C-alpha cells in the first residue's frame, strides 16, 4: 500500500505567509447547503444489468430548500448566499484570486456555475458530477482557467455499502462521490516559463457523525478505502505523482502512522495547537472547535507548501452560549441570516510550484 503524507496542511499559521509569483492557492470549503431553489432531479444508470443503457429517474430530497419549503429558500436568499461565499473566496485570494477551490455541499452545476460567474466572470470554470446522495449535495472543483488545464476528470462512485456489524441487514451507506481531477498547472505571470506540473486532485466529503462518532465510523472508513484505492491507482502508474486530497473528513486528523486517514499507511501531522491561548478549528459544535477539514499531499510535492485556516472575524459571529466566536451560518436554527456564510471555516493551501 502506497503512503501519502499529511504535511502540516490542516493548520493555523500565525502571521502572513509571503507568496511567490508561482504560488498556487488551493482552497477547500464546505459551503453548507448551497442549494438551488428549484426542486432538482437526476438520471442515474440502471443498476440492473439486463436494463443496461436505460436510466432511472431519482428525485432529490431537497424540498426543504425550495421557496415553499421549511427554509423559505427564495432566489433572493440563494443569490445572496452565492455572493457571500464569493466574497470569502475573493478575500482569501487577495489581489490575484484563488486558483483552485474544492467545494463540499453544493447541489448541482447551476450553483457552481453561478459561483464562478460571481467570483470573476469568464475567469473560472468547474468540474461537477451528480452523485446519488439522497439530499442531492455533491462535491465540485472550481479552477482559474489562466492557471489550470484539466487533463482528466471523473466521479469515483462509493457503491451502496451495508453496515458490516449488521451483516448486511439494516443501515446502508449511500453517499457522495469522490471527485478526481488531473490538472496541468500553468505559470501565473508573463515571462515565467510554465513548468507544466501535473497534479492529481481528490475532493471528498465523508459521511457525518450524526448518530454517534463510533456508530458511524464504518461509513467514513468505507469511503476512505475507496479514496485510498484511487490514490493507489495514480501511484501505480507514477510513483512520484503529485497528489492533493482535500475536503471535509468529518473527523479529526490522525497524527500517527496507520491512523486511517484516508487509508492504511498514513502518517499525519495536525496543527491544532491554540493560538494566543485560544482553541482553533474549522467547525464548532457545543462550544468545542474541531478540525474536520483537511489537506493531504504526496511527498513529491514541495515541502515548503503551507496551509492555514481562514478565520477572519467577519465570517464569524459571537458565540453567546459558549463565548468567543463561531462560524456565521446562513441559518441559525431556522432563523435566516442574510450575511451568513457556512458552519465551516475554509482552509487554504499555498503550494510552491517550481519552475
Q: What label would you give each PLM region?
A:
Residues 31, 106, 206, 248-249, ...:
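Active-site metal-binding loops of divalent metal-dependent hydrolases
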Residues 40-45, 196-225, 229:
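Metal-dependent phosphoester/phosphodiester hydrolase catalytic core
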Residues 5-15:
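Bacterial N-terminal signal peptides
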Residues 25, 173, 186, 221, ...:
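Metal-dependent phosphoester-hydrolase catalytic domains
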Residues 25-33, 152-154, 198-208:
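Active-site-proximal beta-strand elements of phosphoester/diester hydrolases
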Residues 19-118, 129-137, 189, 195, ...:
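N-terminal, active-site-proximal structural segment of metallo-dependent hydrolase catalytic domains
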Residues 108-110, 134-136, 209-211, 250-256, ...:
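Active-site environment of divalent metal-dependent phosphoester hydrolases
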Residues 100-102, 106-198:
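Structured beta-strand-rich core segments of catalytic domains in phosphoester-bond hydrolases
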Amino acid at each position: 500500500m502506497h503512503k501519502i503524507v499529511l504535511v502540516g496542511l490542516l493548520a493555523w499559521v500565525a502571521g502572513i505567509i509571503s507568496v511567490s509569483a508561482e504560488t498556487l492557492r488551493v482552497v477547500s470549503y464546505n459551503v453548507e447547503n448551497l442549494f438551488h431553489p428549484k426542486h432538482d432531479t437526476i438520471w442515474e444508470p440502471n443498476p440492473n444489468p439486463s436494463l443496461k443503457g436505460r436510466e432511472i429517474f431519482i428525485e432529490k430530497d431537497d424540498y426543504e430548500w425550495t421557496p415553499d419549503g421549511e427554509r423559505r429558500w427564495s432566489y433572493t436568499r440563494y443569490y445572496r448566499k452565492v455572493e457571500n461565499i464569493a466574497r470569502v473566496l475573493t478575500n482569501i485570494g487577495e489581489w490575484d484570486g484563488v486558483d483552485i477551490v474544492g467545494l463540499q455541499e453544493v447541489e448541482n452545476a447551476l450553483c457552481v456555475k453561478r459561483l464562478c460567474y460571481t467570483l470573476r466572470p469568464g475567469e473560472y470554470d468547474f468540474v461537477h458530477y451528480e452523485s446519488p446522495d439522497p439530499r442531492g449535495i455533491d462535491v465540485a472543483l472550481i479552477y482559474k482557467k489562466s492557471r489550470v488545464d484539466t487533463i482528466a476528470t471523473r466521479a469515483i462512485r462509493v457503491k451502496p455499502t451495508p453496515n458490516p456489524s449488521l451483516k448486511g441487514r439494516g443501515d446502508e451507506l449511500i453517499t457522495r462521490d469522490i471527485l478526481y481531477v488531473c490538472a496541468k498547472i500553468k505559470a501565473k505571470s508573463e515571462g515565467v516559463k510554465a513548468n507544466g506540473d501535473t497534479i492529481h486532485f481528490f475532493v471528498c466529503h465523508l459521511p457525518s457523525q450524526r448518530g454517534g462518532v463510533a456508530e458511524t465510523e464504518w461509513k467514513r472508513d468505507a469511503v476512505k478505502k475507496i479514496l485510498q484505492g484511487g490514490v493507489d491507482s495514480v501511484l501505480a502508474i507514477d510513483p512520484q505523482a503529485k497528489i492533493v486530497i482535500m475536503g471535509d473528513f468529518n473527523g479529526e486528523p490522525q497524527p500517527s502512522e496507520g491512523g486511517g486517514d484516508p487509508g492504511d499507511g498514513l502518517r499525519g501531522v495536525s496543527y491544532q495547537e491554540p493560538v494566543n491561548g485560544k482553541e482553533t478549528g474549522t467547525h464548532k459544535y457545543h462550544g468545542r472547535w474541531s478540525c474536520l477539514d483537511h489537506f493531504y499531499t504526496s511527498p513529491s510535492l514541495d515541502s515548503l507548501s503551507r496551509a492555514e485556516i481562514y478565520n477572519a472575524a467577519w465570517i464569524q459571529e459571537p458565540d453567546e452560549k459558549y463565548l468567543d466566536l463561531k462560524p456565521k451560518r446562513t441559518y441559525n436554527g431556522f432563523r435566516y441570516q442574510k450575511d451568513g456564510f457556512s458552519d465551516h471555516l475554509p482552509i487554504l493551501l499555498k503550494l510552491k510550484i517550481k519552475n
